[in-house]
Amino acid sequence: MSRRNSYTWDELLQCARGEMFGPGNAQLPAPPMLMFDRITHIDSVGGAFDKGMIVAELDVKPELWFFDCHFISDPVMPGCLGLDAMWQMVGFYLGWIGGKGRGRALGVGEVKFRGQVLPHNRLVTYRINLKRVILRKLVMGIADAEMECDGKVIYEANDLRVGLFTSTDDF
């Protein structure tokens, strides 16, 4: 697939099946762990640090799987799923720019939760700003991110780290 600046749900599913960046390279998780419905913009320049950016969206629907179990009679999207979406997006970005290997989250410096996603909400928007990209034997992205719910920033993550590994045997 050619490098584009936006991706549909069906194209994200191709990535989840390993059909986008080639065998053994970056993949997104399959649903229900795929935490966004589309990538609305991805670019290797721009963003807060001029090192690249990616924006994705999740349509919030009351029938999303996590609302039934987190929590019974008090449905809320788990914060860790928003954080995982951010790692997913950094991994996608590394594959999109040509990095080789399987993606693994390597950590995060700081996370702040200032709000919640509830079944009546409409739209989650993730914004990732790459701070540093290493494309050598080590392939790694470091980024800051925000998650908005219906236009209000509710999560912030600084120094998200994702690496691509050609072998995960010793990981």
UniProtKB/Swiss-Prot annotation:
Major site of localization recorded for this protein: cytoplasm
Subcellular location: Cytoplasm
Catalytically driven reaction(s): a (3R)-hydroxyacyl-[ACP] = a (2E)-enoyl-[ACP] + H2O; (3R)-hydroxydecanoyl-[ACP] = (2E)-decenoyl-[ACP] + H2O; (2E)-decenoyl-[ACP] = (3Z)-decenoyl-[ACP]
Pathway field: Lipid metabolism; fatty acid biosynthesis
Highest taxon of source: Bacteria
UniProt GO MF annotations: (3R)-hydroxyacyl-[acyl-carrier-protein] dehydratase activity; trans-2-decenoyl-acyl-carrier-protein isomerase activity
GO cellular component: cytoplasm
UniProt keyword Cytoplasm present: yes
SUPFAM superfamilies: Thioesterase/thiol ester dehydrase-isomerase
Active site residues according to the UniProt entry: H70
Protein keywords: Cytoplasm, Fatty acid biosynthesis, Fatty acid metabolism, Isomerase, Lipid biosynthesis, Lipid metabolism, Lyase
EC code: 4.2.1.59, 5.3.3.14
GO biological process terms, semicolon-separated: unsaturated fatty acid biosynthetic process
Keyword Lyase attributed: yes
Functional description taken from the UniProt entry: Necessary for the introduction of cis unsaturation into fatty acids. Catalyzes the dehydration of (3R)-3-hydroxydecanoyl-ACP to E-(2)-decenoyl-ACP and then its isomerization to Z-(3)-decenoyl-ACP. Can catalyze the dehydratase reaction for beta-hydroxyacyl-ACPs with saturated chain lengths up to 16:0, being most active on intermediate chain length.
Quaternary structure and interacting proteins, as annotated: Homodimer.
Protein family (similarity comment): Belongs to the thioester dehydratase family. FabA subfamily.
HAMAP family registered for this protein in UniProt: FabA (MF_00405)
Protein name: 3-hydroxydecanoyl-[acyl-carrier-protein] dehydratase
Species of origin: Methylococcus capsulatus (strain ATCC 33009 / NCIMB 11132 / Bath)
